[in-house]
UniProtKB/Swiss-Prot annotation:
PANTHER family: ATPASE H+-TRANSPORTING V1 SUBUNIT E1A-RELATED (PTHR45715). It comes from the Archaea. It is a peripheral membrane protein. Component of the A-type ATP synthase that produces ATP from ADP in the presence of a proton gradient across the membrane. GO terms for cellular component: plasma membrane; proton-transporting two-sector ATPase complex, catalytic domain. This is A-type ATP synthase subunit E. Pfam families: vATP-synt_E. The keyword Transport applies. GO terms for biological process: proton motive force-driven plasma membrane ATP synthesis. Has multiple subunits with at least A(3), B(3), C, D, E, F, H, I and proteolipid K(x).
Amino acid sequence: MGAEKITSKIMEDAKIQANVILAEAQKEKEALIKKAHEEAEKKKQAILKKGEKDAEMTRNRILAEARLSAKKNSLEERERTIAKAIQKLEEDLVKLPQKDEYKDILLKMIITGVYSVGGGELDLQLNKNDWKLIDDSTLWALEKEMEDRLKKVTVLKKGESLPIIGGCVVKTADKTKVSDNSLEATFERNLDIIRAKIAEMLF
């Protein structure tokens, strides 16, 4: 084999080798590019997934806050409505002594007070206007009725006038037992029941 042929053979082998190297390099390049694309896609999906998760969390938080705020506003509005209704009842309570049926109500409150302390020698306290409704004959009739019911001598003495809207306060003579049946005290004692009934009617 001549020098020229040897040189040609070397050049041909070198070219083949170079082409093999270039092909492998191209494959590696393409593999790296593909891997880079895959990595980028994975990162993209991860970012999108995190974004979706964050967005969902933000949405849920906003909805929860909105529901909480709506519930709070509803409760506040409910309380305002109940408060207005109670205020109206308090205004009506002040006007109750002016009504025709008030004397019967007052007599029942006195009887309840006498029952509560158990009869005996008692002090009856009213406001100034109500003493005009309860004269001596009415007191005597009340005493007789309570004696018959309690089977116990009962004496109702006129006590001091009180600055109350209406109703009565009944005390034993030794002041060991007191029944506050004033309109305002009765209203206050039953306020929870009143609130519940208002809520039941309105809501």
